[in-house]
Design a protein with these regions (language model features):
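Alpha4 helix (beta4-alpha4-beta5 surface) of REC/receiver domains from two-component response regulators
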Residues: 62, 83-98
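Acidic catalytic/metal-coordinating carboxylates
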Residues: 33-36, 59-62
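Short hydrophobic/Thr-rich beta-strand motif most characteristic of the beta2 strand and flanking loop
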Residues: 25-32, 40
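Active-site beta3 strand of CheY-like receiver
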Residues: 44-50
Length: 119
Protein backbone atom coordinates (compact mmCIF):
# COMPACT_ATOMS: atom_id res chain seq x y z
CA UNK A 1 0.00 0.00 0.00
CA UNK A 2 1.25 3.47 -0.90
CA UNK A 3 1.84 5.63 2.17
CA UNK A 4 1.80 9.41 2.38
CA UNK A 5 2.69 11.81 5.18
CA UNK A 6 0.75 15.09 4.95
CA UNK A 7 2.28 17.96 6.94
CA UNK A 8 0.38 21.25 7.19
CA UNK A 9 -0.58 23.47 10.11
CA UNK A 10 -3.92 24.29 8.44
CA UNK A 11 -6.41 21.62 9.45
CA UNK A 12 -8.64 22.20 6.42
CA UNK A 13 -5.80 21.48 4.01
CA UNK A 14 -4.78 18.35 5.93
CA UNK A 15 -8.35 17.04 5.86
CA UNK A 16 -8.85 17.81 2.15
CA UNK A 17 -5.63 16.04 1.17
CA UNK A 18 -6.43 13.17 3.52
CA UNK A 19 -9.81 12.63 1.88
CA UNK A 20 -8.45 12.78 -1.68
CA UNK A 21 -5.57 10.39 -1.08
CA UNK A 22 -7.56 7.90 1.01
CA UNK A 23 -9.93 7.58 -1.96
CA UNK A 24 -6.86 6.80 -4.08
CA UNK A 25 -6.01 3.93 -1.73
CA UNK A 26 -3.17 5.57 0.20
CA UNK A 27 -2.32 4.92 3.82
CA UNK A 28 -2.27 8.43 5.31
CA UNK A 29 -0.43 9.91 8.27
CA UNK A 30 -1.24 13.50 9.26
CA UNK A 31 1.06 15.95 11.04
CA UNK A 32 0.14 19.49 12.12
CA UNK A 33 3.73 20.70 12.53
CA UNK A 34 7.36 19.90 11.86
CA UNK A 35 8.04 18.00 15.07
CA UNK A 36 5.00 15.77 14.54
CA UNK A 37 6.23 15.10 11.01
CA UNK A 38 9.70 14.00 12.11
CA UNK A 39 8.23 11.82 14.87
CA UNK A 40 5.89 10.19 12.34
CA UNK A 41 8.80 9.39 10.01
CA UNK A 42 10.75 7.86 12.89
CA UNK A 43 7.78 5.55 13.58
CA UNK A 44 7.15 4.60 9.95
CA UNK A 45 8.90 5.76 6.78
CA UNK A 46 6.33 7.04 4.27
CA UNK A 47 6.54 6.54 0.54
CA UNK A 48 6.20 10.30 0.00
CA UNK A 49 5.81 13.50 2.05
CA UNK A 50 3.59 16.48 1.23
CA UNK A 51 5.16 19.29 3.24
CA UNK A 52 3.94 22.82 3.95
CA UNK A 53 6.77 25.35 4.12
CA UNK A 54 5.30 27.95 6.48
CA UNK A 55 4.50 26.47 9.87
CA UNK A 56 5.00 27.71 13.42
CA UNK A 57 7.97 26.26 15.27
CA UNK A 58 9.97 23.96 13.04
CA UNK A 59 9.29 25.27 9.53
CA UNK A 60 9.08 23.20 6.37
CA UNK A 61 12.59 24.00 5.16
CA UNK A 62 14.13 22.76 8.42
CA UNK A 63 11.98 19.61 8.29
CA UNK A 64 13.08 19.05 4.69
CA UNK A 65 16.76 19.42 5.66
CA UNK A 66 16.36 16.89 8.48
CA UNK A 67 14.47 14.47 6.24
CA UNK A 68 17.19 14.64 3.59
CA UNK A 69 19.89 13.94 6.19
CA UNK A 70 18.09 11.04 7.88
CA UNK A 71 15.99 9.63 5.05
CA UNK A 72 17.31 10.92 1.72
CA UNK A 73 15.30 8.31 -0.21
CA UNK A 74 11.90 9.79 0.75
CA UNK A 75 10.51 12.00 -2.03
CA UNK A 76 9.20 15.32 -0.71
CA UNK A 77 6.73 17.63 -2.45
CA UNK A 78 6.41 21.07 -0.92
CA UNK A 79 3.38 23.34 -0.64
CA UNK A 80 3.96 27.04 -0.29
CA UNK A 81 2.04 30.30 -0.31
CA UNK A 82 2.11 32.53 -3.37
CA UNK A 83 5.14 34.81 -3.42
CA UNK A 84 7.55 32.68 -1.40
CA UNK A 85 9.93 32.30 -4.34
CA UNK A 86 13.17 32.37 -2.36
CA UNK A 87 11.90 29.76 0.10
CA UNK A 88 10.77 27.57 -2.80
CA UNK A 89 14.19 27.81 -4.45
CA UNK A 90 15.89 26.90 -1.17
CA UNK A 91 13.61 23.87 -0.80
CA UNK A 92 14.30 22.65 -4.33
CA UNK A 93 18.05 23.06 -3.79
CA UNK A 94 17.72 21.10 -0.52
CA UNK A 95 16.10 18.16 -2.30
CA UNK A 96 12.37 18.74 -2.73
CA UNK A 97 11.16 16.99 -5.88
CA UNK A 98 8.37 19.41 -6.78
CA UNK A 99 6.40 22.33 -5.38
CA UNK A 100 2.86 23.62 -5.47
CA UNK A 101 1.71 27.14 -4.71
CA UNK A 102 -1.39 27.56 -2.56
CA UNK A 103 -4.15 27.61 -3.53
CA UNK A 104 -3.23 24.55 -5.57
CA UNK A 105 -5.15 22.34 -7.99
CA UNK A 106 -5.87 19.20 -5.97
CA UNK A 107 -5.79 17.03 -9.09
CA UNK A 108 -2.31 18.28 -10.03
CA UNK A 109 -1.10 17.45 -6.52
CA UNK A 110 -2.70 14.00 -6.76
CA UNK A 111 -1.01 13.34 -10.10
CA UNK A 112 2.38 14.51 -8.80
CA UNK A 113 2.18 12.26 -5.73
CA UNK A 114 1.13 9.28 -7.85
CA UNK A 115 4.08 9.98 -10.18
CA UNK A 116 6.48 9.71 -7.21
CA UNK A 117 5.35 6.11 -6.75
CA UNK A 118 5.74 5.27 -10.44
CA UNK A 119 9.41 6.29 -10.50
Amino acid sequence: MKSLLIVDDQKGIRLLLDEVFRREGFKITLAANGMEALQAVEREIPGCVLLDMKMPGLDGLEVLKRLKIGWPEIPVIIMTAYGEIELTEDALETGAMKYFTKPFDIYEVRDAVNAMFEN
